[in-house]
């Protein structure tokens, strides 16, 4: 006997409701009835009022979602009623009352009726509100209600902003309040009871941005093992107030999980709900649903996600690979294995049972990436596959719960290549051809022949060769697989029994990677060796031609002689375009000619790559002296025509320059009947660098006392004022002395001039040695006849001498700058020392082997003195008188280091160039005063426009000298200008007003301004008629009086203007010498150089 089945209470309630509806269905249709009827009632305070609600079904009264005390009954006629008695009513009883069906009958009966009751209460103007009802949230732009309700419907109510006392015109309903569209502000309601004004509570209106619900649900892991945690996030974007409701498997068993709400403020804002189960069970597998709804409206959305709880982890292959994988040689190959696993596995790759890892050279790359939650892709990438990488590979993925592995063989296909094709000639007359090649996969061998294999494909196919039934050929092929190299080797041997004419035979190997072939020509044994002989002859001819080409190129790259100095004729208005005097077109004044029979050549003073300087004795140059020792510039017999033209250009320029005390002056020239000779002054003590080296010990002994700094020494002349020296300041006397520290060319053979014209004389001139001490010099008898003032005849090198050398060089450079002359090689090696410590500026590049001189760096067809060059000259090929100022600063450094080499700490490479670009400057020399070093620094200004001109440098150095030295220098200069020096006499013949040209201490006439091209500038070159040259040198002396200057091209500027003497100004009338003094001389051009040699950087 079974027990009765127990039914749930909800089922019994539903059956009861169905039974009541079936019985009372017709009566329910009559609806709810309220007694007394009416939409609203106004009750007196403290009165009693009874309300009855009746219907065919059980009913009840509600007020503000609350159920007041009431009396329910079932009438005799079968209807139901509920009586609500309001006793001793007050203003607080004002409000809505609803008659509804009893909730126990279910939601099917949702009808209700409403009645509103007012209880006017003088003490209560407005009904009290709960605090949460004072905050009114508005979504979008919709109407809303401010519920300031009164107890008396007869009262007049107004609405105000709290901060403004002006009433708002908004409709008012006594039962509901003010209805309208409101801004986000604070509002208050006002009414008047009797003579008393009553204010309501303050209402706050807020607008909420409620966008469409966009829900996203994600889980940290959708697959978890039992015992691990489950975390699911439900996120809503852009909504401020939402409600979350979760549905998940545990709810069926009544085990609830409390979600956690997470607010992430930002733009846009995010609100999230997190459902966390710390310990997952197998029963937690299933669907997790997140339902989101907006609090202020009925919008909503929901999303679901499936979570799987497993007992143990797993690893499963999703794709398999073929057992043999193919890779091509020297091409990258990626091998990919796809599998699924949880938790994350470890992955290893093996080759031939050896573990693989990433190659440091990047030739092998291993990677495993997670493409989804449980899906993985592991890749093996071989970069530029090699033959050695062929073999057996295995991928193994594993973790503590499971593992899986996949193996395959990698075959590297190698293109076929013919390694060897040889022939042999056995004694039996056969021709044996052996072809050996390799490849992977196995290559096939094909032999073919033709009279000319290159033409065969055009007309007919080559004839295949193989085993012949006529026994004309026999073929044998052997195939071997090399395990180490993982490729096949094929050796094929072809025997040709009868070859009576030349044949071209091809061996071709082919596989899936391509083909390769070689050809060989098979000739009969009787073929002559004519081809071999012809080939050898052709090879010798080709080698001879190549050797000649190389020799010609080396000859053309040999550096050419060029004069360094340039004379600027005019500058463009913007300072970036220059026009230089073209020395080729200048005329030559024949008054400088000296007959060759009046010149006796002596020993070589200096020899260079292009020419030499020879000591000589000249007759008839001076009225006061029968003979004069001079220096003669000449080219070597191997000089090219361009170098002869450069020397002639130098002579033409020098013939138009005026004399100066501190410049090596031109005395004469020989241009007819033989080589070109330029005759200049002779300086017995050589160049300044060597002079400083020879006399350094006297300076150091003099200044060994540290308490007596050089800058404090007092200058005094050791000789009395009346002591004289030979005419022309003994510059041309027959005295001993050295010349320049240059390489002596003792092997120079002089071509006797008598062989050419029969007029030149040679003599053994007394040898001079500048190694002799300064004080050992004893003037000869003729020299003692004429004595003049000496600047200094002391044998000891003093600090004043160093400053005096600097001062004299600055005076000479000031003179050159006033003639718009740019030196471009100002250095101590180009400054000579004469008697009385007089210095003269020169350019003896002709007599210096610059190709072996470390001070000159080769660039194309020229050599450049980089250590003395300004930055704009090094990097931009810009040469101006202000770039000479930079070189003057380097010369000062040489003087006060007693002949030191500039930049001793910098090698001549990129380090030197980078240091100059960064603004590196040499340190103060040990023997230089602060004033001298300050002058150096001014000369080394980065911007050449800010460097001082030579006129200013003369004044700066003059301040450092004593009055005695300046008087002696001025006296020597005046005596020089009044003497019968050949340079003075010949210049006076052309320019009568020479003595009034310049005072040695007057520097105001030199102005460093741009020379504007005008007719006056062009007029200073006087087109004098040239002497008729001999046929041998006719081309060098040609110079037409066309334009006095031209913009120089590369050919014209290859020889710069030598400033052994400065350029002379145009002759002016004898009656106006003072006007010439007042006219300022332009000093050069600070703008960029428009031409000249290319920058060597």
Swiss-Prot record:
Topological region Extracellular: 32-531
Q: Where is the composition biased (Polar residues)?
A: 1042-1059
Write down the InterPro entries for this protein, in alphabetical order: Ig-like_dom (IPR007110), Ig-like_dom_sf (IPR036179), Ig-like_fold (IPR013783), Ig_sub (IPR003599), Ig_sub2 (IPR003598), Immunoglobulin_dom (IPR013151), Kinase-like_dom_sf (IPR011009), PGFRB (IPR027288)
Name this protein carries in UniProt = Platelet-derived growth factor receptor beta
Domain called Protein kinase: residue spans: 599-961
Q: Which residues carry this modification: Phosphotyrosine?
A: 561, 578, 580, 685, 715, 739, 750, 762, 770, 774, 777, 856, 933, 969, 1008, 1020
Please summarize the record's notes on activators and inhibitors of this protein. Present in an inactive conformation in the absence of bound ligand. Binding of PDGFB and/or PDGFD leads to dimerization and activation by autophosphorylation on tyrosine residues.
Q: What is the organism field in this record?
A: Rattus norvegicus
Q: Which residues form the active site?
A: 825 (proton acceptor)
């Amino acid at each position: 006997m079974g027990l009765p089945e127990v039914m749930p209470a909800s089922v019994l309630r539903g059956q009861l409701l169905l039974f009541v509806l079936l019985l009372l269905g017709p009566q329910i249709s009559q609806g709810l009835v309220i007694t007394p009827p009416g939409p609203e009632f106004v009750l007196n305070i403290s009165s009693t009022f009874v309300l009855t609600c009746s219907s065919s079904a059980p009913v009840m009264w509600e007020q503000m979602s609350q159920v007041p005390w009431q009396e329910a009954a079932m009438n005799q006629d079968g209807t139901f009623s509920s009586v609500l008695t309001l006793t001793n009513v007050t203003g607080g009883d004002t409000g809505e009352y609803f008659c509804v069906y009893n909730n126990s009958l279910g939601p099917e009966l949702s009808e209700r009726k409403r009645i509103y009751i007012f209880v006017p209460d003088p003490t209560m103007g407005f009904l009290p509100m709960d605090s949460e009802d004072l905050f009114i949230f508005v979504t979008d732009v919709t109407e809303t209600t401010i519920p300031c309700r009164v107890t008396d419907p007869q009262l007049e109510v107004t609405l105000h902003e709290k901060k403004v006392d002006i009433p708002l015109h908004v409709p008012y309903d006594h039962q509901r309040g003010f209805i309208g569209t409101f801004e986000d502000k604070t509002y208050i309601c006002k009414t008047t009871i009797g003579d008393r004004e009553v204010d309501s509570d303050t209402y706050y209106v807020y607008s909420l941005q409620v966008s469409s619900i966009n829900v996203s649900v994600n889980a940290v892991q959708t697959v978890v093992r039992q015992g691990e945690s489950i975390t699911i996030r439900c996120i809503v974007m852009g909504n401020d107030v939402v409600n979350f409701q979760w549905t998940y498997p545990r709810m069926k068993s009544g085990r609830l999980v409390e979600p956690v709400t997470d607010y992430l403020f930002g733009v846009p804002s995010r609100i999230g709900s997190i459902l966390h189960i710390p310990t997952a069970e197998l029963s937690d597998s299933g669907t997790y649903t997140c339902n989101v709804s907006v609090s202020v409206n009925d919008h909503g959305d929901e999303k679901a996600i499936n979570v799987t709880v497993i007992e143990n982890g797993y690893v499963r292959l999703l794709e398999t690979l073929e057992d043999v994988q193919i890779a091509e040689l020297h091409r990258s190959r990626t091998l990919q294995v796809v599998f699924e696993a949880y938790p994350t596995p470890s992955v290893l790759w093996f080759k031939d049972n050896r573990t693989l890892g990433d190659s440091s050279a990047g030739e092998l790359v291993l990677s495993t990436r997670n493409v989804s939650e449980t899906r993985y892709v592991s890749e093996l990438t071989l970069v530029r596959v090699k033959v050695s990488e062929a073999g057996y590979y295995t991928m193994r993925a594993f973790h503590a719960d499971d593992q899986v592995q996949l193996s395959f063989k990698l075959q590297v296909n190698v293109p076929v290549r013919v390694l060897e094709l040889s022939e042999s000639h056995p004694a039996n007359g056969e021709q044996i051809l052996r072809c050996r090649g390799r490849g992977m996969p196995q290559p096939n061998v094909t032999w073919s022949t033709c009279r000319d294999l290159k033409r065969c494909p055009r007309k007919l196919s080559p004839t295949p060769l193989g085993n012949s039934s006529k026994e004309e050929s026999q073929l044998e092929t052997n195939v071997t697989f090399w395990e180490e190299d993982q490729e096949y080797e094929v050796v094929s041997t072809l025997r040709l029994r009868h070859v009576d004419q030349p044949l071209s035979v091809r061996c071709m190997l082919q596989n899936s990677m391509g083909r390769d072939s070689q050809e060989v020509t098979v000739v009969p044994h009787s073929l002559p060796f004519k081809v071999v002989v012809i080939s050898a002859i052709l090879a010798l001819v080709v080698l001879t031609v190549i050797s000649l080409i190389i020799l010609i190129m080396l000859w053309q790259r040999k550096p050419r002689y060029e004069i360094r100095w340039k004379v600027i004729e005019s500058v463009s208005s913007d300072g970036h375009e220059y026009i230089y005097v073209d020395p080729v077109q200048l005329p030559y004044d024949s008054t400088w000619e000296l007959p060759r029979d009046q010149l006796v050549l002596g020993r070589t003073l200096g020899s260079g790559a292009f020419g030499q300087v020879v000591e000589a004795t000249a007759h008839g140059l001076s009225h006061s002296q029968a003979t004069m020792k001079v220096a003669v510039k000449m080219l070597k017999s191997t000089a090219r025509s361009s170098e002869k033209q450069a020397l002639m250009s130098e002579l033409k320029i020098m013939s138009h320059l005026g004399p100066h005390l501190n410049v090596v002056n031109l005395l004469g020239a020989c241009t007819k009947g033989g080589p070109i000779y330029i005759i200049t002054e002779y300086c017995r003590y050589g160049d300044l660098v060597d002079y400083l080296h020879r006399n350094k010990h006297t300076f150091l002994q003099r200044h060994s006392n540290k308490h007596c700094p050089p800058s404090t020494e007092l200058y005094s002349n050791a000789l009395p004022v009346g002591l004289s020296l030979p005419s022309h300041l003994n510059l041309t006397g027959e005295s001993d002395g050295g010349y320049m520290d240059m390489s002596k060319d003792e092997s120079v053979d002089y071509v006797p001039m008598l062989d050419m014209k029969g007029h030149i004389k040679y003599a053994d001139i007394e040898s001079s040695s500048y190694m002799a001490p300064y004080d050992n010099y004893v003037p000869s008898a003729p020299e003692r006849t004429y004595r003049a003032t000496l600047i200094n005849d002391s044998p000891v090198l003093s600090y004043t001498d160093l400053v005096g050398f600097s001062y004299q060089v600055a005076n000479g450079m000031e003179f050159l700058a006033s003639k718009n002359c740019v030196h471009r090689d100002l250095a101590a090696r180009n400054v000579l020392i004469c008697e009385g410590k007089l210095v003269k500026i020169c350019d003896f590049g002709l007599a210096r082997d610059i190709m072996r001189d470390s001070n000159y760096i080769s660039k194309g067809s020229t050599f450049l003195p980089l250590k003395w060059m300004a930055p704009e000259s090094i990097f931009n090929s810009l040469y101006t008188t202000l770039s000479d100022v930079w070189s003057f600063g380097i010369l000062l450094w040489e003087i006060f280091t007693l002949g030191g080499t500039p930049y001793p700490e910098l090698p001549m490479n990129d380090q030197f160039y980078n240091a100059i670009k960064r603004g590196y400057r040499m340190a103060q020399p040990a023997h230089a005063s602060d004033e001298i070093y300050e002058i150096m620094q001014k000369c080394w200004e980065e911007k050449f426009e800010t460097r001082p001109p030579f006129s200013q440098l003369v004044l700066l150095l003059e301040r450092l000298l004593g009055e005695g030295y300046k008087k002696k220098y001025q006296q020597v200069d005046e005596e020089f200008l009044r003497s019968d020096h050949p340079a003075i006499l010949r210049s006076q013949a052309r320019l009568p007003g020479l003595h009034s040209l310049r005072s040695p201490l007057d520097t105001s006439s030199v102005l460093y301004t741009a020379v504007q091209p005008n007719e006056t500038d062009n007029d200073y070159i006087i087109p004098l008629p040239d002497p008729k040259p001999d046929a041998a040198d006719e081309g060098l002396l040609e110079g037409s009086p066309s334009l006095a200057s031209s913009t120089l091209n590369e050919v014209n500027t290859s020889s710069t203007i030598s400033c052994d003497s400065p350029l002379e100004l145009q002759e002016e009338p004898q009656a106006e010498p003072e006007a010439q003094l007042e006219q300022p001389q332009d000093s050069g051009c600070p703008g960029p150089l428009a031409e000249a040699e290319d920058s060597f950087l």
